[in-house]
């Protein structure tokens, strides 16, 4: 009898400790998620799921973490588990689930989920666009072949985007690792912070080997999406809220994005300043100039 009692107490103690450990792991993952460290959060959520833990909140966050990193296949899998646990979801989860399904080629399944999104959010502008253009996929297919898209030959396995041409150079954004001291990774994506790169282009606009762009512009945080005036002497670009060695944060201690301006002097970019409409409390990003250079869109 005494042995049985001890065994029962041992089992209760084990289950109690396991529950406490599980709650601690969930709390740690949630903390990572709430600070946008999605890659770390994903690893913990996945380990919990592998051990059989399931909750609506966890699969909401796991799906979002994949969705915000454009891993739509795994996002769809997570949202599917969420949908199995609770078929009545907030409209945004129907939308993200449908977009993830669509991105993985499951158009019929996506249409079913989108219908639920439309029913729950008839006033949403996305819902209205879907209702007004139900055959948008057919429109896209009808235009296939109008343009020829080729790999530029300078892409890496990381994010490469936000390109423009100035002075026979292709200037673009990349998260590639080209070495150097202090290489840092972004907790959101698990990739290196993006910098600007330059690749010479020939008469056929074929780029050559890219190199890191001007050190006065690139910092230890994100730089992206440059745009230049026609004379090539002024550049507008996106950067994390960081200038002169000082990092700005919003009320939640998050470093957002701002648009900066730089001036070319003696072939070096100088006078990096932020534009006056920036704020610590919201992001401004991805500038574009009108043809007459009188208006900056962002």
Question: How would you describe each model-predicted region?
Answer:
Residues 23, 57, 91-92:
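Start-of-helix register in tetratricopeptide repeats
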């Amino acid at each position: 009898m005494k042995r049985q009692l001890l065994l029962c107490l041992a089992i209760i103690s084990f289950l109690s400790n396991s529950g406490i450990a599980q709650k601690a792991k969930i709390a740690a993952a949630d903390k990572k998620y709430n600070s946008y460290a999605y890659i770390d959060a994903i690893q913990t959520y996945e380990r919990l799921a592998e051990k059989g833990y399931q909750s609506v909140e966890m699969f909401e966050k796991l799906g979002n973490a994949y969705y915000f990193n454009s891993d739509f296949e795994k996002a769809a899998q997570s949202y599917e588990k969420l949908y199995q646990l609770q078929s009545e979801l907030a409209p945004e989860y129907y939308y993200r689930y449908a977009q993830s399904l669509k991105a993985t080629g499951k158009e019929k399944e996506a249409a079913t989920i989108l219908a639920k999104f439309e029913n729950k959010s008839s006033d949403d502008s996305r819902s209205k666009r879907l209702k007004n253009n139900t055959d948008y996929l057919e429109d896209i297919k009808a235009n296939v072949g109008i343009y020829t898209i080729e790999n530029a030959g300078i892409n890496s396995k990381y994010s490469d985007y936000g390109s423009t041409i100035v002075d026979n150079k292709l200037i673009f954004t990349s998260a590639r690792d080209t070495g150097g001291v202090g290489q840092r990774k972004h907790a959101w994506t698990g990739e290196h912070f993006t910098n600007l790169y330059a690749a010479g282009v020939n008469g056929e606009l074929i780029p050559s080997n890219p190199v890191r762009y001007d050190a006065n512009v690139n910092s230890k945080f994100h730089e992206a999406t440059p745009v230049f005036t026609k004379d090539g002497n002024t550049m507008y670009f996106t950067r994390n809220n960081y200038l002169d060695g000082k990092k700005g944060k919003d009320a939640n201690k998050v470093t957002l994005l701002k648009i900066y301006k730089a001036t070319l002097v003696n072939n070096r970019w100088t006078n990096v300043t932020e534009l006056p409409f920036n704020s610590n409390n919201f992001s401004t990003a991805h500038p574009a100039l009108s043809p007459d250079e009188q208006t900056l869109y962002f």
